[in-house]
């Protein structure tokens, strides 16, 4: 949850609300319970995404594995994002922290070859894709998806 767009300009510097920070922390605690091992956390350079990535990295004790990439900014295309991810192809498990509709578009493209395949991630949601090599259309298999509420329930 970010502060109101109308009251915060420029959008790149718009932070999470105190409620949003609390929710992300609980979701990160739920993520920790899954015992996933991330090689890298890639984040959008926008403030609210950076805050989210930092909270997750702290909870998972992965602060040294955070990298910001412009290709996760909301004004980028799915093609830009996938090109940016190619630089990290040697990494096995990467957590992406970005924005909608870019992330849903990328997931849709990787699963179906189309960016509008009705895949929708909620703010703070998470999905796991298994990729076969460098990201290309129809190269992924969805392993699981969790809504933010499910992650928060795992934290209990």
Each PLM stretch: what is its role?
Residues 149-156:
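Short, cationic low-complexity segments
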Residues 90-98:
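Generic beta-sheet signal
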Residues 111-141, 145-148:
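Domain-level recognition of soluble alpha/beta enzyme cores
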Residues 30, 55, 59, 87, ...:
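Active-site catalytic microenvironments for nucleophilic, acid-base chemistry
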Residues 1-72, 76-79, 83, 117, ...:
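Active-site-proximal alpha-helix that buttresses catalytic centers in soluble enzyme cores
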């Amino acid at each position: 949850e970010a502060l109101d767009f109308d009251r915060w300009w420029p959008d790149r510097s718009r932070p999470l609300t105190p409620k949003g920070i609390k929710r992300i922390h609980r979701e990160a605690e739920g993520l920790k319970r899954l015992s996933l091992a991330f090689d890298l956390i890639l984040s959008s350079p926008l403030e609210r995404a950076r805050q989210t990535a930092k909270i997750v990295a702290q909870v998972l004790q992965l602060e040294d594995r955070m990298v910001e990439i412009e290709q996760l900014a909301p004004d980028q295309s799915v093609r830009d994002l996938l090109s940016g991810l190619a630089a990290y192809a040697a990494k096995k498990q990467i957590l992406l922290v970005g924005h909608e509709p870019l992330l849903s578009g990328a997931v849709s493209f990787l699963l179906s070859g189309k960016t509008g395949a009705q895949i929708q991630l909620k703010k703070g949601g998470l999905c796991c894709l298994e990729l076969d090599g460098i990201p290309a259309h129809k190269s992924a298999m969805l392993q699981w998806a969790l809504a933010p509420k499910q992650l928060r329930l795992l934290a209990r």
